[in-house]
A protein has these predicted regions:
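Bacterial N-terminal signal peptides that target proteins for export
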Residues: 1-11
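C-terminal motif of bacterial Sec signal peptides marking the signal peptidase cleavage site
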Residues: 18-20
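Glycine-rich portal/gate segments that line the openings of hydrophobic small-molecule binding cavities
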Residues: 70-77, 84, 100-173, 186-202, ...
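Extracytoplasmic/secreted proteins, especially bacterial periplasmic and envelope-associated proteins
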Residues: 87, 91-95, 209-216, 220
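Mobile, glycine-rich extracellular loop/lid and propeptide segments
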Residues: 176
Length: 231
């Protein structure tokens, strides 16, 4: 069983579930697992027979300015995204916790799960070590993944929070960090909303790089939740 991040002080962040339909409300997240900003991506457009289709929808291109623990500032390309999965929260939460859903099988050369994580690098649930790129310009890096139920119970979650970030690797990749929040769709507990934020500053990257990665990992979470094999 993978460890959960210990619950510390709670951070509140106003989140909007559906722009134009609902107001802001403060949501408490475990310290360090909260999203950086209010998610501004639109929801998937409902249809006559589907309140939230299984597609991912992105915000406009953004730039994020953050602060490192040592006080140094940084900038990174940023995108927000929202999508739905036609499975209840407990099923989607189980899928999210599978380390293999974080693998971009379209771009990595190798992907290794480190569980338990290296304690001097990661205080989370597990790490992934990745080699990506095309030879001879490949990069190696490790990500730390932290996940927790923010509201509800482990086997009956109402809100979950996941954060991942680069903790070791190539200096050609100064910033790589992401956030995933999951919650039930309003009035449709059989459908789960997933909300992403992703920051990337790399030598050869763009907002399209982020768009491609989030499309892949959303698809892997969705397929895992539906019991489909992952490539």
């Amino acid at each position: 069983m993978r460890r959960l991040v210990k619950l510390g002080a709670l951070a509140s962040l106003p989140l909007v579930a559906f722009a134009g339909c609902y107001g802001n409300e403060a949501t408490a997240f475990p310290q360090g697992l909260e999203p950086w900003e209010e998610n501004v991506a639109p929801m998937p457009e409902p249809t006559a027979d589907d309140p939230c289709p299984e597609v991912i929808v992105f915000s406009e291109n953004r730039t994020f300015t953050g602060m490192r623990p040592d006080g140094r500032g940084y900038e990174a390309n940023s995108l927000h995204a929202r999508a739905c999965i036609h499975q209840p929260m407990d099923v989607v939460w189980e899928a999210i916790r599978d380390p293999q859903v974080g693998k971009d099988h379209t771009s990595v050369n190798s992907f290794t799960v480190i569980d338990p994580p290296m304690p001097d690098e990661c205080d989370g649930d597990y790490q992934t070590q990745i080699n990506a790129g095309t030879a001879p310009f490949t990069v190696d890096f490790r990500l730390c993944w932290r996940q927790q139920v923010a509201e509800g119970l482990e086997d009956a979650p109402l809100l979950t929070a996941t954060r991942w970030q680069k903790v070791w690797g190539s200096s050609a990749l100064p910033v790589l960090e992401g956030s995933l929040v999951s919650r039930p769709l309003e009035d449709h507990p059989e459908i789960t909303v997933v909300e992403y934020q992703y920051h990337l500053n790399a030598l050869t990257s763009s907002h399209q790089t982020i768009r491609d990665y989030l499309t892949v990992i959303y698809g892997r979470v969705r397929d895992r939740a539906h019991g489909r094999p992952l490539p």
